[in-house]
Swiss-Prot record:
Cited HAMAP family: EF_G_EF_2_B
Coiled coil spans: none
Cell compartments where the protein resides: Cytoplasm
The protein's name: Elongation factor G
Keyword GTP-binding among UniProt keywords: yes
Residues given in the record as GTP binding sites: 17-24, 81-85, 135-138
SUPFAM superfamilies associated with the record: EF-G C-terminal domain-like, P-loop containing nucleoside triphosphate hydrolases, Ribosomal protein S5 domain 2-like, Translation proteins
Natural source organism: Nostoc sp. (strain PCC 7120 / SAG 25.82 / UTEX 2576)
Signal sequence region: none
Transmembrane segments: none
InterPro entries in alphabetical order: EFG_II, EFG_III, EFG_III/V, EFG_IV, EFG_V, EFG_V-like, EFTu-like_2, G_TR_CS
GO terms (BP aspect): ribosome disassembly
The protein's role, per its UniProt record: Catalyzes the GTP-dependent ribosomal translocation step during translation elongation. During this step, the ribosome changes from the pre-translocational (PRE) to the post-translocational (POST) state as the newly formed A-site-bound peptidyl-tRNA and P-site-bound deacylated tRNA move to the P and E sites, respectively. Catalyzes the coordinated movement of the two tRNA molecules, the mRNA and conformational changes in the ribosome.
Gene3D superfamilies: 3.30.230.10, 3.30.70.240, Elongation Factor G (Translational Gtpase), domain 3, P-loop containing nucleotide triphosphate hydrolases, Translation factors
Length: 692
């Protein structure tokens, strides 16, 4: 089957922003104007096409990244609508991993919010080119120029306006296109009657100022244009457009557009900008991968290269288990056998579908540059690489943050017991930030995630989709343990002689604090075979397993580096099990001597309230052991940035509403782990041992 769209005419884009910037509404308008839907759905009415889970339609927020294929002016556009709530950061993260370009949506009133910064950092991590759409220009308090400056100041983006609004708030009636130097006036509510006119006289000076900035920015992308600019020659529209494209794809320019998706203004011009400035799969660097022998390799966006695809999302579905994939090279065919190179397992593709939110279109194949979903992949999880059997390669996987909050769940009846384990398995396959553990002592099932809303929605899905009734415990903080000082030559010796074959394992280790985020590191410096090679692995495994439960309060031990320096063995009595136990004993003994401490997750909390309430809010954050980092006031609104322990933040959404008469908003995301103050740590440790 031949390719329908040439690769140069494919755009894989995401729509990303902070909550309430209008991402889902923007997506709906794109689908309306590109002919996928014939009636516009609204988020606040619960009818948006991309918000298709019950919870999304009820809450008016986008939880999972819905993938949709559409077209505009002979270009195939694959869109992922991502959530703006920080509890669903993994959805944004995995979308960024598979996209070639992003539309970053900002609210013209709220401007650059904390979550905007998080999304921007994620796009930076994957070097995704982006254009910005300053939305809600019809709202009271809308200010395009303020948000444009915030992008430059807070995001350190080279934000270059390529449009200017004509009017704002209730008087927002059109857009100036700086590249064409033309004005577009909207004459009806549907945004379909657009009149192209000269630029209004009262905007001429402002247009000249921003046009000059645009020309200066594009001239810097090309030596020939720079010479032309310095010689005082005007740049042509085509030269400006071409240089803007070059700068956007290189990540040195972010074109800034404006409009009101809700009022149907500016969306078609934004689609033109997607086609004009965001890259085709052939214009982004080839994907990096690793061969089975460890050598690095690249795969180019080309149908004739061997297959390389990344699974970026798993979803339980009435049709079966859907695996969303981005095909980077080659062709993925229905009915074919493929290799999951990450797990070295052969799998069969039974069906391939293109997504129109919760509607599916069966296809025979997905080609390089395509986003789609496969059915039939039983063992494939998020982050796995799918390849041809004869040309295995492992692509760089996703960055998956650790969960910071957990709750215990218990089935209400015996009948719910089996259903609960199936539901938890299915949900954890879909969402790698959702973890399930069974406490070996209490046999209690504990689920962990990225925040209260995250777990609340997952418990809600267990009831709706899997019909599981469950009791949910109070939220628990994911504490960790670590050490503060290095220790050397700590022994772990396991000897058991009771007639017949005995047991003998003996190791000597050094233990030191590791770099933050490294977890457990192991190095062997054994020389001369004092510990045979076959026993070094088991000794390491024993230490690693020992880290699962720290000595202070049973929380996982992190950021430690163990070095095996010496040991001994017995020709007859030594075994892998004996060295595993000896490794575990050595690590526990070393931790005892290395000043163990308890760590707690610190959250980056940003609060926005009318300035009358700021004193109360700051006092409350300090009472929660918070550290105030910055404070600013703008147009009667005060913003406070702080770091606060997660343990003190449960129920904060309710508290801030009552303290500000419902007018305060906040965002919270994980920042880092920090040592718990001694008095607080003593209480936590006592509680863990049943003494409190």
């Amino acid at each position: 089957m031949a390719r329908i769209n040439p690769l140069e005419k494919v755009r894989n884009i995401g729509i990303a922003a902070h909550i309430d910037a209008g991402k889902t509404t923007t997506t709906e308008r794109i689908l309306f104007y590109s002919g996928i839907i014939h009636k516009i759905g609204e988020v606040h009415e619960g009818t948006a096409v991309t918000d298709w889970m019950d919870q999304e339609r009820e809450r008016g927020i986008t939880i999972t990244a819905a993938a949709i294929s559409t077209s505009w002016k002979d270009y195939q556009i694959n869109i992922i609508d991502t959530p703006g709530h920080v509890d669903f950061t993994i959805e944004v993260e995995r979308s960024m991993r598979v996209l070639d370009g992003v539309i970053a949506v900002f609210c013209s009133v709220g401007g650059v919010q904390p979550q905007s910064e998080t999304v921007w950092r994620q796009a930076d991590r994957y070097k995704v080119p982006r254009i910005a759409f300053i939305n809600k220009m019809d709202r009271t308090g809308a200010n395009f120029y303020r948000v444009h400056e915030q992008m430059r100041d807070r995001l350190r983006a080279n934000a270059i306006a390529i449009q200017l609004p004509i009017g704002s708030e209730n008087d927002f009636k059109g857009i100036v296109d700086l590249v064409r130097k033309r004005a577009y006036m909207y004459n009806n509510d549907q945004g379909t009657d657009i009149e192209e006119t000269d630029i209004p006289a009262d905007l001429q000076d402002q247009v000249e100022e921003y046009y000059t900035k645009l020309v200066e920015a594009v001239a810097e992308t090309d030596d020939d244009l720079m010479s032309k600019y310095f010689d005082g020659e005007p740049l042509t529209e085509e030269e400006i457009r071409s240089a803007l494209r070059k700068g956007t794809i290189a990540g040195t320019i972010v074109p800034v557009l404006c409009g009101s998706a809700f009022k149907n203004k500016g969306v078609q011009l934004m689609l033109d900008a997607v086609v004009d400035y965001l890259p085709a799969p052939t214009e982004v660097p080839p994907i990096q991968g690793t061969l089975p022998n460890g050598d690095a390799i690249e795969r180019r966006a080309d149908d004739n290269e061997p297959l390389a695809a990344l699974a970026f999302k798993i979803m339980a579905d009435p049709y079966g288990r859907l695996t969303f994939v981005r095909v980077y090279s080659g062709v993925l065919k229905k009915g074919s056998y493929v290799l999951n190179a990450t797990k070295n397992k052969k799998e069969r593709i039974s069906r391939l579908v293109l997504m129109k939110a919760d509607d599916r279109q069966d296809v025979e194949e997905l080609r390089a540059g395509d986003l789609g979903a496969a059915l039939g992949l039983k063992d494939t999880l998020t982050g796995d690489t799918i390849t041809d059997e004869g040309a295995p390669v492992i692509l760089e996987s996703l960055f998956i943050p650790e969960p910071v909050i957990s709750v215990a769940v218990e089935p209400k009846t015996k009948n719910d017991m089996d259903k609960l384990s199936k539901a938890l398995q299915s949900l954890s396959e879909e969402d790698p930030t959702f973890r399930v553990n069974v406490d070996p002592e209490t046999n209690q099932t504990v689920i962990a995630g990225m925040g209260e809303l995250h777990l609340e929605i997952l418990v809600d899905r267990m009831l709706r989709e899997f019909k599981v009734e469950a009791n949910v415990g109070a939220p628990q903080v994911a504490y960790r343990e670590t050490i503060r000082k290095p220790v050397t030559n700590v022994e772990g010796k396991f000897i058991r002689q009771s007639g017949g074959k005995g047991q003998y394992g003996h190791v000597v280790i050094n233990l030191e604090p590791g770099e933050p985020g490294t977890g457990f590191e192991f190095v062997s410096k054994i020389v001369g075979g004092v510990v045979p090679k076959e026993y070094i692995g088991p000794a390491e495994q024993g230490m690693k397993e020992s880290c699962e439960s720290g000595i202070l309060a049973g929380y996982p031990l992190i950021d430690v580096k163990a070095t095996l320096v010496h040991g001994s063995y017995h020709d007859v009595d030594s075994s892998e099990m004996a060295f595993k136990i000896a490794g575990s004993m050595a690590l526990k003994e070393a931790v005892l001597k290395a000043s163990p401490v308890l760590l707690e997750p610190m959250m980056k909390v940003e609060v926005e309230v009318p300035e009358d309430y700021i004193g109360n809010v700051i006092g409350d954050l300090i009472s929660r052991r918070g550290q105030i980092e910055s404070q600013s006031t703008e147009q009667g609104l005060a913003k406070v940035a702080s770091k606060v322990p997660l343990a003190t933040m449960f129920g904060y959404a309710t508290d801030i509403r009552s303290k500000t008469q419902g007018r305060g908003i906040f965002t919270m995301e994980f920042s880092h782990y920090e040592e718990v103050p001694r008095s607080v740590a003593e209480t936590i440790i006592a509680k863990s041992k049943g003494n409190a």
